[in-house]
């Protein structure tokens, strides 16, 4: 009996069906070690269909060992057949790939949990608000602050800084250190401290008369500084005067005074500008001599000095005089400031040479010997 064409004696061969568009192929590790060829083995395969990503290490090792065995090389010290039989089994490769997947997943989970924990910690820090105490508490605490600790106290918080701007704070500080036997100028006496204008500057000046730690600082200044002061560079000369000093010497000495105002550095942004006190305390913080200092040079004889008021002080040197017994001071003034790295020739600018020099002193605006106006 003849059979029809649809009934074959042998089994039908397996047919490979192409996947639909958009469905990803499963790339199994044992496929690389078998004789089956898939679309993923070709370089021009569709990336939308073929699974993207790197080849797992277990699959790469199996392929490498099979290639070595086909080329007649040994994958390791064991024969190629043993290597293929031991490593090429699908179950072992799947187990190793599963272990690597588990390790990768655990690593990702740890990194994600660490990021969440750091983010939660940052949110806790941002949301943590401290206690805000009233202004009276800070004013009470300020009564126990030493004069040298005022800056540290004002940096605690904004309310503490605001307290240091008030007239009550500076008045209490003055009364706490005032003594009846204190030798003070007329402007720094108690009857003159009732004025609010320049109150802060006057209290600071009085502390250098009454407060022992501050008075000890200025008493250690030598007649000739050990090193040339560098803080006066690019300062503007506001005033100049000289006076005759009659002392124990047979011949009088001459005192030359230069009043300078230090130039504030250029600020790149307005956020870096100096912190201004509240408007109601502007008079308390007013100081006409802010950033000013006085250079006082005493010579053994009179020396003619050119007009330097309004000019910029650029160079200051102190050397040994020609007689090897005194000092020689050289001052150089320019019409404009000297920027960093700019070198000037020796003949440029207006030069003032004082020789022989008896003493050189530099007084800041709070120094007791600094001449300040009684109207301040």
Swiss-Prot record:
What family does the Swiss-Prot or TrEMBL record give for this protein? Answer: Belongs to the TMEM183 family.
Tell me the membrane topology, using the record's own terms: Single-pass membrane protein
Output this protein's name. Transmembrane protein 183
Q: Which InterPro entries match?
A: F-box-like_dom_sf, TMEM183
Taxonomic lineage per UniProt?
A: Eukaryota, Metazoa, Chordata, Craniata, Vertebrata
Q: Transmembrane stretches, by residue range?
A: 300-320
Gene of origin?
A: Tmem183
Cellular component, GO annotation: membrane; SCF ubiquitin ligase complex
Segments of skewed composition (Acidic residues)? 95-106
User: What keywords tag this UniProt record?
Assistant: Membrane, Transmembrane, Transmembrane helix
Q: Where in the cell is it found?
A: Membrane
């Amino acid at each position: 009996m003849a059979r029809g064409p649809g009934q074959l004696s042998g089994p039908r061969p397996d047919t490979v069906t192409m996947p639909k568009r958009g469905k990803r192929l499963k790339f199994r590790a044992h496929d690389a070690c078998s004789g089956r060829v898939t679309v993923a083995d070709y370089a021009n395969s569709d990336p939308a269909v073929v699974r993207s990503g790197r080849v797992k290490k277990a699959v790469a090792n199996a392929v490498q060992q099979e290639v070595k065995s086909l080329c007649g090389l040994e994958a390791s010290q064991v024969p190629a057949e043993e290597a293929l039989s031991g490593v090429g089994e699908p179950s072992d490769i799947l187990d190793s790939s599963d272990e690597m997947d588990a390790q990768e997943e655990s690593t990702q989970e740890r990194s994600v949990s660490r990021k969440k924990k750091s983010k939660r910690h940052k949110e806790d820090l941002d949301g943590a608000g401290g206690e805000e105490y009233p202004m009276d508490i800070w004013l009470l605490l300020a009564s126990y602050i030493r004069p040298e600790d005022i800056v540290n106290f004002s940096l605690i918080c904004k309310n503490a800084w605001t307290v240091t701007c008030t007239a009550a704070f500076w008045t209490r500080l003055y009364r706490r250190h005032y003594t009846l036997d204190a030798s003070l100028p007329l402007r720094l006496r108690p009857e003159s401290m009732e004025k609010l204008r320049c109150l802060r500057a006057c209290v600071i000046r009085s502390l250098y008369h009454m407060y022992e730690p501050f008075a000890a600082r200025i008493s250690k200044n030598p007649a000739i500084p050990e090193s040339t002061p560098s803080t006066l560079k690019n300062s503007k000369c506001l005033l100049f005067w000289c006076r005759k000093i009659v002392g124990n010497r047979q011949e009088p000495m001459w005192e030359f005074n230069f009043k300078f105002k230090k130039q504030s550095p250029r600020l790149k942004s307005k956020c870096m500008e100096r912190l201004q006190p509240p408007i109601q305390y502007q008079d308390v913080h007013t100081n006409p001599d802010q950033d000013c200092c006085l250079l006082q040079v005493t010579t053994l004889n009179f020396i003619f000095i050119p007009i330097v008021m309004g000019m910029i002080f650029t160079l200051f040197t102190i050397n040994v005089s020609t007689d090897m017994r005194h000092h020689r001071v050289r001052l150089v003034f320019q019409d404009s400031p000297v920027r960093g790295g700019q070198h000037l020739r020796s003949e440029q600018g207006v030069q003032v040479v004082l020789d022989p020099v008896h003493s050189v002193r530099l007084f800041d605006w709070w120094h007791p010997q600094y001449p300040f106006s009684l109207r301040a």
